[in-house]
UniProtKB/Swiss-Prot annotation:
Its main location: mitochondrion. A ubiquinone binds at residue 201. This is Cytochrome b. Heme b b562 binds at residues 83, 182. Heme 1 (or BL or b562) is low-potential and absorbs at about 562 nm, and heme 2 (or BH or b566) is high-potential and absorbs at about 566 nm. InterPro entries: Cyt_b/b6_C (IPR005798), Cyt_b/b6_C_sf (IPR036150), Cyt_b/b6_N (IPR005797), Cytb/b6-like_sf (IPR027387), Cytochrome_b (IPR030689), Cytochrome_b_C_euk/bac (IPR048260), Cytochrome_b_N_euk/bac (IPR048259), Di-haem_cyt_TM (IPR016174). Binds 2 heme b groups non-covalently. It is found in: Mitochondrion inner membrane. The gene is MT-CYB.
Length: 379
């Protein structure tokens, strides 16, 4: 008799995507981040669900309800900090996952890549709205500054911002709708993840060499299930270290002050995972230009497949591109640092140089490097 996992309509789907899935025999730890992102999403949905049971999305009680969760709810502090730091781990995995895709040329799987970009935008939107919910100073002013950016859109900008706010400033209506969106988006993300995987399984996984691996496949289970579990353990260890030893390390002290529309904090800045984009936004001395640069800093991922002119898919055997890739990583770290600094000399100039370098590497230098490497192949 055939095994039930191969015949049962529901189990058959699970079997084809998690058990008997043919996987390349040489995928490295960089391929762990997909499953780690799945784990992060599950952690966020579960902790978020329990937080939502005790949270109130009203301007008068939001801050107090978060305090109540931390003080009076059983292990509420743990749930709250798991959720807050879980978001940080989520973005660490996200950026590693995207970086892996760029390095090994995974963006040639167009549908998978494009769904991935939509997922990135969705996760960023969710994280932004979640940051507003505790209704501290940085929540309020972050929401005010970022939503205000939409007013740079010609003609409809101001109307659009007031429509999003549900009034003439960030207030009760804004908080309530942000809570509603913050609750629903993770489930939309989960659905998009299914589509992401559906498209991935049409082609199969890429591998470090960038060479088709159809001639050398191994079953996902037990080889990669055990490898994924090791990743899960390491991620959980890191998250628990963060939550139990320094839960506020990545947060902003200003968010422990209740929101006050009459008092602007000296330095308004987003969470660390948005600082690179924030630095790019600030480095352009024009509102609309800054907003366009901000959107393009992420949307530029969509043109990677168009700029791929190398004869090799992966960067594994392309030393010039490798050097440029790691300069790009260093540049993003520089931008992240600049995003957290005040707008004054020399940070302004460093930010502008780093922003120009970011776009130059992607749009000009990497394609040029590919041309040179193609030439070298002929010698």
């Amino acid at each position: 008799m055939t095994n039930i996992r191969k015949t049962h309509p529901l189990l058959k789907m699970v079997n084809h995507s998690l058990i008997d899935l043919p996987a390349p025999s040489n995928i490295s730890a960089w391929w762990n981040f997909g499953s780690l992102l799945g784990l992060c999403l599950i952690i966020q949905i579960l902790t978020g669900l329990f937080l939502a049971m005790h949270y109130t999305s009203d301007t008068l009680t939001a801050f107090s309800s978060v305090t109540h969760i931390c003080r009076d709810v059983n292990y509420g502090w743990l749930i709250r900090y798991l959720h807050a730091n879980g978001a940080s781990m989520f973005f660490v995995c996200l950026y590693m996952h995207v970086g892996r895709g760029i390095y090994y040329g995974s963006y040639t799987y167009l549908e998978t890549w494009n769904i991935g970009i939509i997922l990135l935008f969705a996760v960023m939107a969710t994280a932004f709205m979640g940051y507003v919910l505790p209704w501290g100073q940085m929540s309020f002013w972050g929401a005010t500054v970022i939503t205000n950016l939409l007013s740079a859109i010609p003609y409809i900008g101001t109307t659009l911002v007031e429509w999003i706010w549900g009034g003439f400033s960030v207030d009760k209506a804004t908080l309530t709708r942000f809570f509603a969106f913050h609750f629903i988006l993770p489930f939309i993300i989960a659905a998009l993840v299914m589509i992401h995987l559906l498209f991935l399984h049409e082609t199969g996984s890429n591998n470090p060499s960038g060479i088709p691996s159809d001639s050398d496949k191994i079953p996902f289970h037990p080889y990669y299930t055990i490898k994924d579990i090791l990743g899960f353990l390491l991620l959980t260890l890191l998250l628990l270290l963060l939550v139990l030893f320094s839960p506020d390390l990545l947060g902003d002290p200003d968010n422990y002050t209740p929101a006050n529309p009459l008092n602007t904090p000296p330095h308004i800045k987003p969470e660390w995972y948005f600082l690179f984009a924030y630095a790019i936004l600030r480095s352009i001395p024009n509102k609309l230009g800054g907003v366009l640069a901000l959107v393009m800093s992420i949307l530029i991922l969509a043109i990677f497949p168009l700029l791929h002119i190398s004869k090799q898919r992966s960067m594994m055997f392309r030393p010039i591109s490798q050097v440029l890739f790691w300069i790009l990583v260093a540049d993003l770290l520089t931008l992240t640092w600049i995003g957290g600094q005040p707008v004054e000399h020399p940070f302004i100039t460093i930010g502008q140089v780093a922003s120009i370098l970011y776009f130059s590497i992607i749009l000009i230098l990497l394609p040029l490097a590919s041309l040179v490497e193609n030439k070298i192949l002929k010698w």
